[in-house]
């Protein structure tokens, strides 16, 4: 299934609409046809689980237009979501955005901003958002993010190297495109972040060439400072991610589904581990194949996923049933 097969009737609003029209459009809607899924299968929902403060503690998958769904979630989740990850349409001409060419770019910008403004309201004050884009809209995406979240809350531009330069892409008479961009923003400067370290490789381990009287290895940091291998955490991850292969280069993974643009679980694991902790709420309002939700479930996070296309049943829902069953 390609994104071109997934034609969308998206909802936009802009400054030409009267404020009352916008308010009516974004009034909270009633969610219907709820069902509960657990290890025993599907059940009729008899109510949502809540904590002592009345906060919903169930994981939610919502089928519907994500603009309306986001607006409807505000009552329950405003200020409560710790992490948002989205992998929105890249506006390539092959992703369902088949509008009049003269409005294509502006339509994408309006589409993104409408949703980001509501998404920001859902984030907790120590929350973060990651938005994944390619060269088509990454730079315009940053301008929108600067406007919605504030330029001072821009944290990093993460470059994800897709893998080996092979196949039809290598035939271009130009520098070969080999990366996507992930924009990392926080809601405030007081954001939650867990620094991640990678194991040392063989060359890096050789730098611990000193040995003290007790036989412990160390390396010299400064004239007066040593770092012992036993105390070293590893190599802190930078904003260049070249150690996670995309499905453009990995073709035999059991994760792969019939869906263009699917992201590997390792990518979401890194993002979720970096910017959330167990029990925190993770939101993905472009749920797609459900990778974010599957990884969040495995990592003990609460999650909310939104997808309007009918494949929500055959892709994210069926995938999560397997995860819930213990995959």
Indicate residue ranges for each PLM-predicted region.
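Class I S-adenosyl-L-methionine
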Residues: 234, 238, 242-276
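DnaQ-like (DEDDh/DEDDy) 3′-5′ exonuclease domain used for proofreading
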Residues: 1-83, 92-106, 114, 158
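Phosphate/ATP-binding catalytic cores across multiple sugar-kinase/actin-like superfamilies
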Residues: 66-69, 73-76, 115-116, 222-223, ...
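Conserved proline-anchored active-site loop of SAM-dependent methyltransferases
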Residues: 79-95, 145, 282-296
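Flexible, glycine-/basic-rich loop-and-beta segments that form/coincide
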Residues: 162-227
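Conserved SAM-binding loop
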Residues: 62, 130-131, 285, 305
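Conserved S-adenosyl-L-methionine
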Residues: 105-109, 264-327
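Conserved Class I SAM-dependent methyltransferase catalytic core
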Residues: 105-160, 317
């Amino acid at each position: 299934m390609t994104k071109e097969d997934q034609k969308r009737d998206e909802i936009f609003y802009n400054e030409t609409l009267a404020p009352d029209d916008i308010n009516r459009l974004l009034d909270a809607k009633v969610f219907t046809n709820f069902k509960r899924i657990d290890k025993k299968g599907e059940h009729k929902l008899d109510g949502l689980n809540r904590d002592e403060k009345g906060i919903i503690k169930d994981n939610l998958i919502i089928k519907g237009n994500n603009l309306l769904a986001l607006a409807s979630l505000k009552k329950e989740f405003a200020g409560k979501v710790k992490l948002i990850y989205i992998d929105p349409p890249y506006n390539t001409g092959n992703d369902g955005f088949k509008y009049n060419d003269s409005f294509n770019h502006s339509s994408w910008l309006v589409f993104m901003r409408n949703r980001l403004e509501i998404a920001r309201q859902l984030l907790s004050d120590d929350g973060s958002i990651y938005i994944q884009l390619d060269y088509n809209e990454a730079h315009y995406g940053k301008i929108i993010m600067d406007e919605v979240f504030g330029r001072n809350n821009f944290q990093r531009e993460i470059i994800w190297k897709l893998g080996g330069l092979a196949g039809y892409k290598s035939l271009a008479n130009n520098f070969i495109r080999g990366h996507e961009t992930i924009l990392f923003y926080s809601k405030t400067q007081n954001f939650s972040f867990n620094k991640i370290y990678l194991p040392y490789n063989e060359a890096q381990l050789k730098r611990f060439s000193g040995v003290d009287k007790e036989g412990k290895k160390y390396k010299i940091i400064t004239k007066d400072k040593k770092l012992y291998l036993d105390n070293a955490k590893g190599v802190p991850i930078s904003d260049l991610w070249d150690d996670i292969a995309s499905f453009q280069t990995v073709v035999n993974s059991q994760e792969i589904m019939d869906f263009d643009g699917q992201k590997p679980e390792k990518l979401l694991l890194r993002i979720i581990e970096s910017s959330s902790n167990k029990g925190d709420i993770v939101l993905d309002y472009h749920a797609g194949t459900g990778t974010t939700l599957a990884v969040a479930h495995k990592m003990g996070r609460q999650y909310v996923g939104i997808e309007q296309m009918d494949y929500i049943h055959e892709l994210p829902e069926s995938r999560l049933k397997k995860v819930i069953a213990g995959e």
